[in-house]
From Swiss-Prot:
CDD domains: STKc_CaMKII. The lineage of its organism: Eukaryota, Metazoa, Chordata, Craniata, Vertebrata. It comes from Rattus norvegicus. It is found in: Sarcoplasmic reticulum membrane; Synapse; Cytoplasm, Cytoskeleton; Cytoplasm, Cytoskeleton, Microtubule organizing center, Centrosome. The modification Phosphoserine is found at S367, S371, S394, S397. This is Calcium/calmodulin-dependent protein kinase type II subunit beta. ATP binds at I20, G21, K22, G23, A24, F25, S26, V27, V28, K43.
């Protein structure tokens, strides 16, 4: 009888050291190859937690990274599978993000921006020559090899990269990062290598003035701007940029991908290949200051996500008021959170001032040079980014990388099912509620005084004696729904829930709870197996 030999090559050949990054199913650690003493970054993926599709994506990423051997790309040196884990051994890049390095420089000019984009284009050209489209070019994926002056720019994170044949155009799914998405992707048309050039155009624009060409606090409006190619070169900051630099941006941000400049052509553009005579050598202090603010906002992604309203606002139950309206109390609470986020941002961004002549409400953050809107604040999610690791993390930001369609659809499914469950609660419909919940549902909630409750009887009491007898309108608003997909058939959602209702004296009230629900799909149908509720009781008892 044959015995299975477990591979231990990584364990035998490498010594692991400290963590340098984390992802959803992985950790990145510094490691040393024992026989040479050379340092690397080991991306360690827990394969026990991966679905079959996740395995395919891992294999695709490793296959693509093995193809790419270029001085401006983070190189994969080894790919090793052991029992329960897969190890990807990459270059150890220690210089941090390119954009962070720029703001620390004493001198920064158009010529420096030209040198940066040249290295990025060299990396993109190599990818395209090897039949690879990156699909997620953005500042977070542009690293420096070391902290030495003049260190090479390195393109990282090929988690969304795809393989194409020649100049093949096809629909490969909706993936990328909102502010850097091309018009053809937003129109859901066939696409290919030109999407990377569009993203290079966005990056070059930021490199020259410190803010993005497309931005809006409303993602739909942001997408409309991109599809229309609606950007400009406003005074006074663009007055000092050479016409050649603007010309290259225009050729990169050409709406028609067939007419868009290629990486090979862009490298031959005078502003790139003749920078010493064409690009301006003037120090761009205003660009550095704007870039500092741009970077500060990217780093404050987490603070914004926990305070900004998500776009999901829905009404359920016996509602007699206008749909999707908020009570003054609820509105005041959320506006306060937004103002706190703005205050924090402005302190971190060296006193950025919102534009005062804006006609938008006080919670909007305006002016591309001063206070950028939420859509422009982040590095541009996957709701998942770890600069070292390239694993995508989950968030609702405009600067986050968008996931592949299947993961996105699954998250929407979880949010919709959660809405249905809350609707059943507000309607006092225990039968509908029980269909969505596992019979062995466990929960921690204020009504149980901190005790773990198992089964449906505890909840049935509230349905039969309170909820089913309530004839007054109830309106629920979900804020910041945050879904973590756990394999193919499990997920967790966390959100803030505002419940508006009329109390016994006929006065409008609002209660807030913070909730987490764990969902499982045993037979193709999602069921709530556990939930944790903090804050005020879900059922308004007044």
């Amino acid at each position: 009888m044959a015995t299975t030999v477990t591979c231990t090559r990584f364990t035998d050949e490498y010594q692991l050291y400290e963590d340098i990054g984390k992802g959803a199913f992985s950790v990145v650690r510094r490691c040393v190859k024992l026989c040479t003493g050379h340092e690397y970054a080991a991306k360690i993926i827990n394969t026990k937690k991966l679905s079959a599709r996740d395995h395919q994506k891992l294999e695709r990423e490793a296959r693509i990274c093995r193809l790419l051997k270029h001085s401006n790309i983070v190189r994969l040196h080894d790919s090793i599978s052991e029992e329960g884990f897969h190890y990807l051994v990459f270059d150890l890049v220690t210089g941090g993000e390119l954009f962070e390095d720029i703001v620390a420089r004493e001198y920064y000019s158009e010529a420096d921006a030209s040198h940066c984009i040249q290295q990025i284009l060299e990396a993109v050209l190599h990818c395209h020559q090897m039949g690879v489209v990156h699909r997620d070019l953005k500042p977070e994926n542009l690293l420096l090899a070391s902290k030495c002056k003049g260190a090479a720019v390195k393109l990282a994170d090929f988690g969304l990269a795809i393989e194409v044949q020649g100049d093949q155009q096809a629909w490969f799914g909706f993936a990328g990062t909102p502010g850097y998405l091309s018009p053809e992707v937003l129109r859901k048309e066939a696409y290919g290598k030109p999407v990377d050039i569009w993203a290079c155009g966005v990056i070059l624009y930021i490199l020259l003035v410190g803010y993005p060409p497309f931005w809006d606090e409303d993602q739909h409006k942001l997408y409309q701007q991109i599809k229309a190619g609606a950007y400009d070169f406003p005074s006074p900051e663009w007055d000092t940029v050479t016409p050649e630099a603007k010309n290259l941006i225009n050729q990169m941000l050409t709406i028609n991908p067939a007419k868009r400049i290629t990486a090979h052509e862009a490298l031959k553009h005078p502003w790139v290949c003749q920078r010493s005579t064409v690009a301006s050598m003037m120090h761009r202090q205003e660009t550095v200051e704007c870039l500092k603010k741009f970077n500060a906002r990217r780093k404050l992604k987490g603070a914004i996500l926990t305070t900004m309203l998500a776009t999901r606002n829905f009404s359920v139950g016996r509602q007699t008021t206008a749909p999707a309206t908020m009570s003054t109390a609820a509105s005041g609470t959320t506006m306060g959170l937004v103002e706190q986020a703005k205050s924090l941002l402005n302190k971190k961004a060296d006193g950025v001032k919102p534009q005062t002549n804006s006609t938008k409400n006080s919670s909007a953050i305006t002016s591309p040079k001063g206070s950028l809107p939420p859509a422009a604040l982040e590095p541009q999610t996957t709701v998942i980014h770890n600069p070292v690791d390239g694993i995508k993390e989950s968030s609702d930001s405009t600067n986050t990388t968008i996931e592949d369609e299947d993961a996105k659809a699954r998250k929407q499914e979880i949010i919709k099912t959660t809405e249905q469950l809350i609707e059943a609660v507000n309607n006092g419909d225990f039968e509908a509620y029980a269909k969505i919940c596992d019979p062995g549902l466990t929960s921690f909630e204020p009504e149980a005084l901190g005790n773990l409750v198992e089964g449906m009887d505890f909840h049935r009491f509230y349905f039969e004696n309170l909820l089913a007898k309530n004839s007054k309108p109830i309106h629920t608003t979900i804020l910041n729904p945050h879904v973590h997909v756990i394999g193919e058939d499990a997920a967790c959602i966390a959100y803030i829930r505002l419940t508006q209702y009329i109390d016994g004296q006929g006065r409008p009230r609002t209660s807030q709870s913070e909730e987490t629900r764990v969902w499982h799909r045993p037979d193709g149908k999602w069921q709530n197996v556990h939930f944790h509720c903090s804050g005020a009781p879900v059922a308004p008892l007044q």
